[in-house]
Design a protein with these regions (language model features):
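Short glycine-/small-residue-rich flexible loop motifs, especially phosphate/cofactor-binding loops
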Residues: 32, 76, 93
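Short, flexible active-site-proximal loops enriched in glycine and acidic residues
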Residues: 40-41, 83-91
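Divalent metal-dependent phosphate-bond-processing catalytic cores, especially two-metal-ion Mg2+/Mn2+ enzymes
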Residues: 2, 13-40, 51, 101-187
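Short alpha-helical hairpin
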Residues: 1-10, 48
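Short amphipathic alpha-helical interaction patches enriched in hydrophobic/aromatic residues
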Residues: 12-16, 35, 54-62, 79, ...
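An active-site-proximal "capping" alpha-helix that borders the catalytic cofactor pocket
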Residues: 27, 66-81
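His-Asp-centered metal-binding catalytic motifs of divalent-metal-dependent phosphohydrolases/nucleases
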Residues: 42-61, 67, 71, 91-101
Length: 187
């Protein structure tokens, strides 16, 4: 297997900011917090965390194709070209395809990625990520944050993730309430 991690990091950095390498770094940090002493394939999770959103990057995105589906397509080609073993590719693709579905019938690696990705959309960081997607549309950012606040906690699988989410949800509620108050509802 000839995987150049520096190349992967560079490609994530090329996309940039909160949707590229910084999001990936937060996910990997969250995985260390929620994994506890659980045994999992660290290498596969590292690769999946870096590749899971590539299908949403302008370089690889396809209009009308879900970013997780497209990310799996891109990752499969990328990993195959570099001699990654089929079993490892299959595990990484499972992680990527299911990283935002909440499907409980998955490997621990897929659950770790899904939970960490969800947690990164909660709390202050999550709200700011939603608002950054629509800087000229406050209502759009607000509605996206409110929807994630309702949906994501139901998708979390691990107790460690649910514990982390509790504090992030309180933070999110405080921020959204302050936003409502500060805008007088005019947004």
């Amino acid at each position: 297997m000839d995987i150049d991690k520096d190349e992967i990091i560079r490609l994530c950095e090329e996309y940039g900011g909160e949707w590229g390498i910084n999001h990936t770094r937060r996910i990997l940090h969250l995985i260390t917090l929620i994994a506890g002493g659980k045994q999992y394939d660290i290498e596969a999770v590292w690769l999946a965390a870096h590749l899971h959103d590539w299908g949403g990057y302008p370089k690889w995105a396809k209009p009308g194709v879900d970013h997780a589906v497209r990310s799996a397509e891109v990752a499969e080609g990328f990993l195959s070209e570099r001699g990654c073993p089929k079993a490892t590719i299959d595990l990484i693709l499972e992680c990527i395809r299911s990283h935002h579905t909440g499907d409980p019938a998955r490997s621990l690696e897929a659950i770790l990625l899904s939970d960490a990705d969800g947690l990164d959309f909660l709390g202050t960081v999550g709200v700011l990520r939603d608002f950054s997607k629509a800087p000229l549309d406050l209502r759009g950012g607000y509605n996206a944050a409110k929807k994630r606040r309702e949906v994501i906690p139901k998708l979390l699988c691990l107790e460690e993730s649910k514990d982390l989410a509790a504090a992030r949800l309180m933070e999110m509620d405080e921020l959204l309430t302050a936003f409502e108050r500060g805008t007088f509802g005019y947004f």
